[in-house]
Amino acid sequence: MSNIQNMSLEDIMGERFGRYSKYIIQERALPDIRDGLKPVQRRILYSMNKDGNTFEKGYRKSAKSVGNIMGNFHPHGDASIYDAMVRMSQDWKNREILVEMHGNNGSMDGDPPAAMRYTEARLSEIAGYLLQDIEKNTVSFAWNFDDTEKEPTVLPAAFPNLLVNGSSGISAGYATDIPPHNLSEVIDAVVYMIDHPKASLEKLMEFLPGPDFPTGGIIQGADEIKKAYETGKGRVVVRSRTEIEELKGGKQQIIVTEIPYEVNKAVLVKKIDDVRVNNKVPGIVEVRDESDRTGLRIAIELKKEADSQTILNYLLKYTDLQVNYNFNMVAIDHFTPRQVGLQKILSSYISHRKDIIIERSKFDKAKAEKRLHIVEGLIRVLSILDEIIALIRSSDNKADAKENLKVSYDFSEEQAEAIVTLQLYRLTNTDIVTLQNEENDLRDLITTLSAIIGDEATMYNVMKRELREVKKKFANPRLSELQAESQIIEIDTASLIAEEETFVSVTRGGYLKRTSPRSFNASSLEEVGKRDDDELIFVKQAKTTEHLLLFTTLGNVIYRPIHELTDLRWKDIGEHLSQTISNFATEEEILYADIVTSFDQGLYVAVTQNGFIKRFDRKELSPWRTYKSKSTKYVKLKDDKDRVVTLSPVIMEDLLLVTKNGYALRFSSQEVPIQGLKSAGVKGINLKNDDSLASAFAVTSNSFFVLTQRGSLKRMAVDDIPQTSRANRGLLVLRELKTKPHRVFLAGGVQSDASAEQFDLFTDIPEEETNQQMLEVISKTGQTYEIALETLSLSERTSNGSFISDTISDQEVLVARTR
């Protein structure tokens, strides 16, 4: 019981998780800066080498290797070991593969490898150079997980594997992404740094200008590469290698022969084909994966008139034909994860190789000295051969003979052992010469090794020679092309859109769609698909290259390119704005819709219930970044109850504002200033406390009408409302009643020509040709009335007009609109 300690759970959890984090950082996901290997990779290579599963021998079942690795060094499950082994065999993920594998080891399409019982593996030839001299006490060893066997903590690494094959992994609080590089270039940089320990980054980059991905491609951004080599972090653009191929009949196709590193080819082909299926860019006929054993090839066949460069730019921008590669060069350096630059990686590798060469030389020197000692004894024996033979013959046994040799002739234990085990044929004159030559060779070797151990310059010459030997044997050309500047992809979106005629429809409730002329002409206007409680407010023929602007009662504007509208039948309801616009409110309604060809010029005027008015420029409505998911403001409302009453393009005429209490004010539209989208505007009319604006319209005719909520209608002359200035109260156009007073429901201009453009949100709906402007009124009981406005007689300003029916006063007006 004395060993039991009381500790808080908080302290225990923190301390234990700290241990766990340290373990997975050092022992799982991050590579060592010296050999560039994670522990599982190192264990795989060491175990296969220890078992003799090397490149000069036959392949061995992967399952056997995995079992040995798991049983002796890595008790974390066979899947993780096999996955790591397979990855080291994939030539599209490693610049130099470390494991050779027979059988299905996966593919660039993301296909899984065959089970380990079906595949065979062995170390590659270059992997042997990572393990070279490991038997010569060159690296430290540690006990394995069950203290039954020792394993190396690092490999000798005769080439800089961390840079050559790169690394990627995620640990607790750390992640690493080190790109692969060309073996020749890396070795050239190491050799230069050996000769120039304080070499500048710029000079090193003359030898190692950038990554070299096994999948090739084009790497753009020299400044970012330099930043990454300096700080350990950076980002470059990796672009596919493409070419435009001419076909018969004037057609073209885009051929992709190299894709960015770590991009799944099958997913890439699917994404490109999705662009074709969804017609995001017109002109693509077919997408084919024509890859075979000779290499990668993706063919994107185009229509005859398609703009191949524009389509290619679109695919580069919106698919993984072009990606960003983010450098995050983190490695374990002296048991600590560090973000390292190129100079640190190279200097750490050189320091590691220095230790390896010195320890190897010490081992070889000790071995040579031991052998020299034996050879010296054997040569001495040959000079007194008869005496030695006589002594051995007179001895009782081997041990007695050894003791007699040591006592009588002062031989050492090792020399005595060699003498008594000497075979008789070795006593020929030929063997004497051989021993003398061996003695000379051993003395020369010891001198050389002593120089390596004692003289740093000699040691570095050995290091450079060995690196150059690796380069000579395994060098291959660079696969990735380097370009200094990242090219900005510019897409002429207009050229991507096929120009087609279509009909656009919008309802007050926010449903919109586009319909082909064929579907539109096959139906009548009344057959439009809509909800029973909704109202069609806009139908217009347009082109798919044009733009739709929707202005709402809450002061928001929604932008939609017409080609992005859902193409539906005329009888379909359409897509509701709430499906895409996240800030579209439940009570929000569409007030006005407009189709524009460009945003170069044009003004709009907006009038709110609170009597404020503003003009704003169409240029400010050019597409914003988040237009697909959010609307933007075109006017700021004064309070939550305020609403926009009227919005329309500005014409150079007077404006006439009519309030619910019957006040009318007329002033020039030029009095209204042009303001930004976020402003609330200026006061258009001076309202009483209990009043609000009912209607606003441009004066384009000699008369206008006023409809009250009780169904009373009158027509009066515009001149009865003289032009004045904005922000005044205006004149009454209704006579005040003590009981059941009239309130303005709708007011607007009376046109002599029904096709004339009117400052009213309903005029865009196409109707059958008529010479009369009609007012449609629907009562709260559902009764519909139609009145030809031009047939109304002019009334006095102070009159309340006439009821449109005998019963309308009791029913009251629900909806009113002109057409």
From Swiss-Prot:
Keyword Ribonucleoprotein: no
Site-annotated residues for Interaction with DNA: 38, 74, 76, 87, 93
Marked site (Transition state stabilizer) residue numbers: 117
Gene3D superfamilies: 3.30.1360.40, DNA gyrase/topoisomerase IV, subunit A, C-terminal, Topoisomerase II, domain 5, Topoisomerase, domain 3
Active site: 118
SUPFAM superfamilies linked: GyrA/ParC C-terminal domain-like (SSF101904), Type II DNA topoisomerase (SSF56719)
Start and end residues of each Topo IIA-type catalytic domain: 30-496
Domain of life: Bacteria
A GO term, aspect molecular function: ATP binding
Enzyme class: isomerase
Acetylation is among the record's keywords: no
Keywords from the UniProt entry: Cell membrane, DNA-binding, Isomerase, Membrane, Topoisomerase
Membrane topology designation: Peripheral membrane protein
Compartments, as annotated in UniProt: Cell membrane
Coiled-coil stretches noted in the UniProt entry, renumbered to this chain: none
A UniProt-annotated Pfam family: DNA_gyraseA_C
Gene Ontology CC terms: chromosome; cytoplasm; DNA topoisomerase type II (double strand cut, ATP-hydrolyzing) complex; extrinsic component of plasma membrane
EC number of this enzyme: 5.6.2.2
Disulfide bridge positions per record: none
UniProt family annotation: Belongs to the type II topoisomerase GyrA/ParC subunit family. ParC type 2 subfamily.
Known function: Topoisomerase IV is essential for chromosome segregation. It relaxes supercoiled DNA. Performs the decatenation events required during the replication of a circular DNA molecule.
NCBIfam families per the UniProt record, alphabetical: parC_Gpos (TIGR01061), PRK05561.1 (NF004044)
Self-association state and partner proteins as the record states: Heterotetramer composed of ParC and ParE.
Protein name: DNA topoisomerase 4 subunit A
The organism of origin for this protein: Streptococcus pyogenes serotype M6 (strain ATCC BAA-946 / MGAS10394)
